[in-house]
């Protein structure tokens, strides 16, 4: 899978509100806020199932009601269409889980 060009990344990010291109590396990132830890953990559980099915896994961390996510395709050395697809799936799951 090929890395997205700078213009392709920018076009993808326009369709992904809340996602940012990370300056320190070839990746995109986002933070999700939930009402409480249970909602945050429920979101992570649902994403884990989708990520496993897609065989593409996020880098993430959870502190109480916040989930910080970084997406990149290590084999390609940057952001690919797989990251964009997973970001869209995560946004849909987050909405169903009550993210703010």
UniProtKB/Swiss-Prot annotation:
InterPro entries from the UniProt entry: PCD_sf (IPR036428), Pterin_deHydtase (IPR001533)
Keywords: Lyase
GO BP: any one term: tetrahydrobiopterin biosynthetic process
SUPFAM superfamilies: PCD-like (SSF55248)
Domain of life: Bacteria
Pfam families, A to Z: Pterin_4a (PF01329)
Keyword Metal-binding (UniProt): no
Substrates-to-products reaction catalysed: (4aS,6R)-4a-hydroxy-L-erythro-5,6,7,8-tetrahydrobiopterin = (6R)-L-erythro-6,7-dihydrobiopterin + H2O
UniProt EC number: 4.2.1.96
Family, similarity comment: Belongs to the pterin-4-alpha-carbinolamine dehydratase family.
Protein name, per record: Putative pterin-4-alpha-carbinolamine dehydratase
Organism: Rhodopseudomonas palustris (strain TIE-1)
Lineage: Bacteria, Pseudomonadati, Pseudomonadota, Alphaproteobacteria, Hyphomicrobiales
């Amino acid at each position: 899978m090929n890395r997205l060009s700078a213009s392709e990344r920018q076009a993808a990010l326009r369709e992904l509100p809340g996602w940012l291109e990370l300056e320190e590396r070839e990746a995109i990132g986002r933070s999700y806020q939930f009402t409480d830890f249970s909602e945050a953990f429920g979101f992570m559980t649902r994403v884990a199932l989708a990520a496993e099915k897609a065989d593409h896994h996020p880098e993430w961390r959870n502190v109480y009601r916040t989930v910080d996510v970084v997406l990149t395709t290590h084999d390609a050395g940057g952001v690919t269409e797989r990251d964009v697809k997973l970001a869209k799936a995560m946004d849909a799951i987050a909405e169903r889980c009550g993210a703010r």
